[in-house]
């Protein structure tokens, strides 16, 4: 599954650390308005989780983690992101800015197949808590929180 992360703050970086090592998941791209060098620094050194065990560097305007190149963008408008060209299956929306059904739509318009909103969202977006209400999950859903 090809994943893009929109918003590389506390939640985006925490998700990255878990997903990067998970079989079947590939972090393809990150979109964040911060400077690339700063994003790399914050991934390397976390005040809660400590030093990241994988090597992290910046090369050719990409984040390189354990020899894996990750595209990095600094785009305010998600509709302008190249999710279609990158064949993104899921965007993890962790910016905190796109917390409604309608606000997540630009990611889908840009070519992502699904959006997972990490913040509380409006009532149109199904709220799923793993281990509690997994029965709400369906392949037909394009957005969940």
Per-region residue spans from a language model:
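N-terminal Rossmann-like NAD(P) cofactor-binding subdomain of oxidoreductases
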Residues: 1-145
């Amino acid at each position: 599954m090809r994943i893009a992360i929109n918003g590389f703050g506390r939640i985006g970086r925490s998700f990255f650390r878990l997903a990067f090592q998970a079989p079947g998941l590939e972090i393809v791209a990150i979109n964040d308005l911060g400077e690339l060098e700063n994003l790399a620094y914050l991934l390397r050194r976390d005040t809660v989780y400590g030093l990241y065990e994988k090597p992290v560097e910046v090369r050719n305007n990409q984040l390189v983690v354990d020899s894996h190149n990750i595209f990095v963008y600094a785009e305010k408008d998600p509709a302008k992101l190249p999710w279609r060209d990158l064949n993104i299956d899921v965007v993890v929306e962790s910016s905190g800015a796109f917390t409604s059904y309608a606000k997540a739509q630009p990611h889908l318009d840009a070519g992502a197949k699904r959006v997972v909103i990490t913040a509380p969202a409006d009532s149109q977006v199904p709220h799923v808590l793993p281990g509690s209400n997994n029965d709400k999950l369906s392949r037909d859903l394009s957005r969940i929180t």
